[in-house]
Amino acid sequence: MCAAAAAESQHPQGADAGSRVVAYVQGGSIPAVIHPGKLTHINFSFAHITAGRALLDQPGVADDLAKLRALKKQNPKLKVIVSVGGWLADGFSDAALTDSSRRAFARSAIVLLREYTLDGIDLDWEYPGQGVAGIKYRAEDKENFTLLLKTLREELDAESDARGRAGSDRYILTIAAADREYFDHVEMSKLHVYVDWINEMAYDFFNSLTSTTGHQAGLYPSQFSAATDRNGDAAVKQYLAAGVPTAKIVLGVPFYGRGFAGVTPQNNGIKQPYEHYEGDHSYDELVGKYIGKQGFVRYWDEQAQAPYLWNSASRTFISYDDPQSIANKVCYVRERHLGGMMFWDLGSDRDDELLNAIARGCSR
C-alpha cells in the first residue's frame, strides 16, 4: 500500500469537472444507439453484493460491457464505471462492518475492474442506517460507510499506481446519494474527501411513499410546497453546508416520471392526496402516450421550474422532467460551478430529447 493511498481525492475525474455528464445504464437494456460524444461517464447498473463481495454475474454482462467499452472508439475520453447496489440491494451493511470485510469488498471491486477493463466504482447504497427498502442496516453504518470509502480509495489508488494510471486515468470512486434524513445516517463532511464526486439524486422527492402528489424533481419550492418538502436547490445547499466542494456535486435528474391516480381534483392535481401510486413512466413513454395525449395537459410551475401532467377525467397526475426543466438545471449547475449532471437512465430517452438539453449547455 503506498503511503499516499488514503489521501483525499484531489483530482475530479473526466473532462473538466463542471462538464461531467454521467449516464446510468441498466444491464440488459443497453440502447441500440448511443451517442458517446454527449457523455463523459457511463455507470453500468448494477453489480450486486453476495457474501460480502461485489459480483457481476447476470446473463449478458460481458456483452453489455463490451458494447459500452466499444464507445471509447468514438469518444476516447469516455469512462465506463460499474455501479454497485441500487434500490432494494442488500449486503452493504455486512460488507462495511469490519476492517477485514471492507478490505475483502474493496478487493472484489478491483477484480471487476480488471476482469471487465473498467474505469471506476460507484456505490449506490440505498441507504446506510435505514431500512426503508427492507435491507439489513445497523446504526454503525454511519461510520462504517466512511471507512468503506476510505478502504476503496486506498485500494483504487494502489491499483492505479500499479497499472501506471495517472491524472484523469486514475481509477474513479463515486457514490449516489440523497438528501435530508440521508445526512443523519452518513458522515458527509468526512466521506466526501475519499470520492471523486457525488451523484446527487435530486429526484424522487415525491413517490409511492409520500402522502400527496408533488414535484418529484422540482428545482425550487413553489406556492404549492410545504416547508418540509424537498427540492434540488435545498439539497445542493445541504451538501455545501457539509463542506462538499462544488466541483464534487453532480446534480441528478430523472429521465422518467411518477404517476399518481385517484388524485383530489384541485390545483390541477398538484400537492393533493391520491388513492394509489399509478407507476413510473420512461420519458419515451410519456412522449408517446401521455404528453398532450389521452386528455393529459402539460402545466408549468414557474416557481419550482418544473412541468407536470394532469388528466382531469381520470384524476391522474404525473410529475417528470422535460427539456425545459432540464435546460434550467443545466444553467443552475453552470452558474453555481457544480461538477456536472447525472441522469437515470439512458434507456428512457432513446431519441436524446433530454440528453440533448444537457448537451446544448446553458443558453442564458
Question: Where would I find each of the regions flagged by the language model?
Answer:
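Substrate-binding surface in catalytic domains of secreted glycosidases
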Residues: 22, 51-62, 128-288
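Glycan-recognition patch characteristic of GH18 chitinases/ENGases
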Residues: 11-113, 130, 140, 149-151, ...
